[in-house]
């Protein structure tokens, strides 16, 4: 087989959706094929995720420049991988891991290693004249992901009083991905009208969801249910609800402090139980703190049979942590974020471990995004069946949805889409 030899590697500093710098990498092969990838950035980050290398120079971009990561790509990384076969992804990623030599990519930065890893895969796919999802996933990559769509932002993603970070709609009644997006967009616009009529701001947060200055979780959920019904849908047949609590942000000294409440782990689990009884919530992310292992076990025992319990900060796309969670029965699903681990190979290894343990995998964006659509392709290549990539506004979010709509059109009858409650089974 002809090798796809890397001829040139180049990185630059560009801006993400929050106006902060991030790393973009371009790789050119000897046959002229190229691949370009840009790296996202999180605001709500797990303690154990791979390090995003920043310059810490307050005179540039408020200390958030990424010239150190860019220098690493253009220097030590380029010197190591030029001449390597871009189609040998595992060898390239192994070289990146060994070059860094730390457990959390703190030497070169996960923003440097991931940019190179993704750009290399894209260059190889283009050399083979294949879409990235087909190159990565083979002929069996045909499952369109079920979207978990953020419609109200809170927490560190918005300047409002909501403690919970994301309120999501789950279009369980749609029979195709494009239909799920259409239905969800209709609910989104109905929610905008409702917020305006009630005198709330319709400004959006980092992930494109509305960020009204409401104070309670219940009011946010009531508004969403109203929007669903105003769009002529129901929570029985068309939509369920989801939450990203991001509870680590309000957990301290074994107490959860939010909305004028101070709850123990046991009390918070009971609060969630009552919330699920009142509202059609079928997915909850980071409902317990990443440090509260006993709380996670309590929650999983109480709600794990009826609600998808997604671990993000708990697992940070790290196989060691995923293995521990599966063994100790914490959560029942894993959020997969490539920049939490730093290479494409490690990302797919984490997905494989998640699936083999009987857990669900949810491919995810970050709150600081670019127009890069790689996660859309990873979702299909891995046949994971779920994606979380923000709301139905802001082009950095819509780029991912639009790419999936294009892929669905390309797959035509071969596209599989699990709706109703099948996406969690």
Swiss-Prot record:
InterPro entries: Enolase, Enolase-like_C_sf, Enolase-like_N, Enolase_C, Enolase_CS, Enolase_N. It is found in: Cytoplasm; Secreted; Cell surface. Disulfide bonds: none annotated. Keywords: Cytoplasm, Glycolysis, Lyase, Magnesium, Metal-binding, Secreted. GO terms for cellular component: cell surface; extracellular region; phosphopyruvate hydratase complex. It catalyses: (2R)-2-phosphoglycerate = phosphoenolpyruvate + H2O. Pathway: Carbohydrate degradation; glycolysis; pyruvate from D-glyceraldehyde 3-phosphate: step 4/5. Its cofactor is Mg(2+). One of its GO terms (biological process) is glycolytic process. SUPFAM superfamilies: Enolase C-terminal domain-like, Enolase N-terminal domain-like. It is an enzyme of class 4 (lyase). Gene3D superfamilies: Enolase-like C-terminal domain, Enolase-like, N-terminal domain. GO terms for molecular function: magnesium ion binding; phosphopyruvate hydratase activity. Catalyzes the reversible conversion of 2-phosphoglycerate (2-PG) into phosphoenolpyruvate (PEP). It is essential for the degradation of carbohydrates via glycolysis. This is Enolase. It comes from Wolbachia sp. subsp. Brugia malayi (strain TRS). The gene is eno.
């Amino acid at each position: 087989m002809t090798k796809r030899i890397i001829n040139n590697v180049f990185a630059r500093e560009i801006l993400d959706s929050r106006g902060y710098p991030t790393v973009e990498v371009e790789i050119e092969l000897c046959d002229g094929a190229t691949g370009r990838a840009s790296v996202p950035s999180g605001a709500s980050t797990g303690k154990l995720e791979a390090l995003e290398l920043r310059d810490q120079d307050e005179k540039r971009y408020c200390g958030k420049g990424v010239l150190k990561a860019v220098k690493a790509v253009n220097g030590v990384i380029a010197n190591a991988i030029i001449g390597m076969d871009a189609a040998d992804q595992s060898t390239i990623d192994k070289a990146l891991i060994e070059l860094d030599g730390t457990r959390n990519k703190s030497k070169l930065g996960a923003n440097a290693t991931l940019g190179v890893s993704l750009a290399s895969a894209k260059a190889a796919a283009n050399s083979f004249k294949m879409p990235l999802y087909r190159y990565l996933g083979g002929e069996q990559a045909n499952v369109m992901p079920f979207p978990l769509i953020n419609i109200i932002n809170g927490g560190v993603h918005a300047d409002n009083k909501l403690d919970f970070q994301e309120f999501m709609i789950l279009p369980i009644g749609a029979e195709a991905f494009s239909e799920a997006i259409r239905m969800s967009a209709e609910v989104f616009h109905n929610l905008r009208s409702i917020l305006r009529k009630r005198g709330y701001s319709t400004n959006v947060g980092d992930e494109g969801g509305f960020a009204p200055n409401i104070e309670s979780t219940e009011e946010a959920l009531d508004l969403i249910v109203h929007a669903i019904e105003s769009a002529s849908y129901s929570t029985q047949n068309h939509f369920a609800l989801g939450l990203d609590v991001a509870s680590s942000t309000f957990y301290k000294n074994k107490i959860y402090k939010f909305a004028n409440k101070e709850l123990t782990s046991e009390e918070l689990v009971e609060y969630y139980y009552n919330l699920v009884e009142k509202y059609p919530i079928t997915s909850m992310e980071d409902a317990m703190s990443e440090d509260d292992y006993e709380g996670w076990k309590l929650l999983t025992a109480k709600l794990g049979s009826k609600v998808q319990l997604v671990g993000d900060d708990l697992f940070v796309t790290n196989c060691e942590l995923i293995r521990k969670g599966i063994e100790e029965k914490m959560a029942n699903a894993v959020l997969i974020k490539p920049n939490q681990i730093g290479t494409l190979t490690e990302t797919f290894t984490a997905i494989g471990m998640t699936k083999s343990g009987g857990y669900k995998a949810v491919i995810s964006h970050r709150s600081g995004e670019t127009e890069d659509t790689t996660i859309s392709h990873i979702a299909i290549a891995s046949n994971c069946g779920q994606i979380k990539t923000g709301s139905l506004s802001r082009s950095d979010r819509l780029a991912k949805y639009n790419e999936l709509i294009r892929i669905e059109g390309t797959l035509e009858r071969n596209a599989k889409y699990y709706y109703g409650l099948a996406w969690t089974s």
